């Protein structure tokens, strides 16, 4: 199971007395509870941008491990600032479980699910920011085409964007069912019969845009890596190819020497600063996919920090674009 694999990967870094682990996307606290149970001496810092999820996980985790849990309402690219504020500038383990939580998917009025009619919100933090309806009703056709193509990998992006602009001129978008129907009608009939629900890619693109998910992830990974102690471990669970490619690209920058490849001797401090713990991206087992269909798309990558930052710190390659 994925949780068991996460525990196995984190275990060598969390065995030391006083170890601190960060769950950067604590959600309902499933992974966090497993970590706190498996490692009774570990302290956990949990972050989440969703105040509803944080309230629920707080009830669960504070009861499970009194005095060992600190929960903070924050987006995970704020991890360095949060850890400094809490007095934990260096930690032994960090976990990212990306994407939409079960709570968000299963709560109708959040608007994440294209299979149910709901307000077009899609904010992971409903206390701030623009909604999916705001994006649909204010972005021009070119901007809509761009996000559908880049974030949804939608080959009919321009057709869908044009249909959105035309439809909103009559009535602004407010609910998910209307958008799902429009996408289905905008896509050629043969394409509707393959690849699952035709609205899936459009909803993914809007969600990523509303929550700036790839931009946040591109900032969060370097900050998280810098907060890791030497021998500390970072585990990332991604749920679509855009996330996974970004994770791979960012971390690969730390796995390479920061000198020309033909240099005969690598200077001290210029060598790789991590080693991969996973060979490529690990999927969920077939058993887990059968028990939990939402695990079907997961890709797990993990690394161990092997060296501190050099004085001439080189930023990892990659980014959100």
From Swiss-Prot:
Annotated localization: Cytoplasm
Keyword entries, A-Z: Cytoplasm, Methyltransferase, rRNA processing, S-adenosyl-L-methionine, Transferase
Highest taxon of source: Bacteria
EC primary class: transferase
An annotated GO cellular component: cytoplasm
Gene Ontology biological process terms, A to Z: rRNA base methylation
EC numbers: 2.1.1.199
Sequence positions that bind S-adenosyl-L-methionine: 29-31, 48, 76, 97, 104
UniProt cross-references to NCBIfam families, sorted A to Z: 16S rRNA (cytosine(1402)-N(4))-methyltransferase RsmH
UniProt name for this protein: Ribosomal RNA small subunit methyltransferase H
Taxonomic source organism: Frankia casuarinae (strain DSM 45818 / CECT 9043 / HFP020203 / CcI3)
Gene: rsmH
């Amino acid at each position: 199971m994925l949780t068991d694999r996460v525990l196995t990967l984190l275990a060598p870094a969390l065995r030391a007395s006083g170890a601190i682990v960060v769950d950067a996307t604590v959600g309902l606290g499933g992974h966090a509870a497993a970590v706190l149970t498996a490692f009774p001496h570990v302290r956990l810092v949990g972050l989440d941008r969703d105040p509803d999820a944080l309230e629920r996980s707080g009830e669960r985790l504070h009861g499970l491990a009194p005095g060992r849990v600190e929960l903070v309402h924050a987006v995970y690219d704020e991890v360095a600032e949060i850890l400094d504020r809490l007095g934990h500038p260096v930690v032994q383990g960090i976990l990212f479980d990306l994407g939409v939580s079960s709570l968000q998917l299963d709560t109708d009025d959040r608007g994440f699910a294209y299979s149910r009619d709901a307000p077009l919100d899609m904010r992971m933090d409903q206390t701030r920011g623009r909604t999916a309806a705001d994006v649909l009703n204010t972005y021009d056709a070119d901007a809509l085409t761009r996000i559908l193509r880049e974030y949804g990998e939608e080959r009919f992006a321009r057709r869908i964007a044009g249909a959105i602009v035309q439809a909103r001129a009559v009535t602004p978008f407010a609910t998910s069912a209307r958008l799902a129907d429009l996408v289905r009608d905008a896509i050629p009939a043969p394409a509707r019969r393959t690849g699952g629900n035709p609205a899936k890619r459009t909803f993914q693109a809007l969600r990523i845009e509303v929550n700036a998910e790839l931009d946040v992830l591109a900032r969060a990974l370097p900050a998280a890596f810098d907060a890791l102690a030497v021998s500390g471990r970072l585990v990332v669970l991604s749920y679509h190819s855009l996330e996974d490619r970004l994770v791979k690209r960012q971390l690969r920058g730390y796995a390479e020497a920061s000198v020309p490849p033909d240099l005969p001797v690598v200077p001290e401090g210029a060598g790789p600063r991590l080693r991969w713990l996973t060979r490529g991206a690990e999927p969920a087992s077939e058993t887990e996919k059968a028990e939990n269909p939402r695990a079907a798309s997961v890709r797990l990558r993990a690394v161990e920090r092997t060296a501190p930052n050099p004085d001439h710190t080189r930023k990892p390659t990659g980014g959100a674009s």
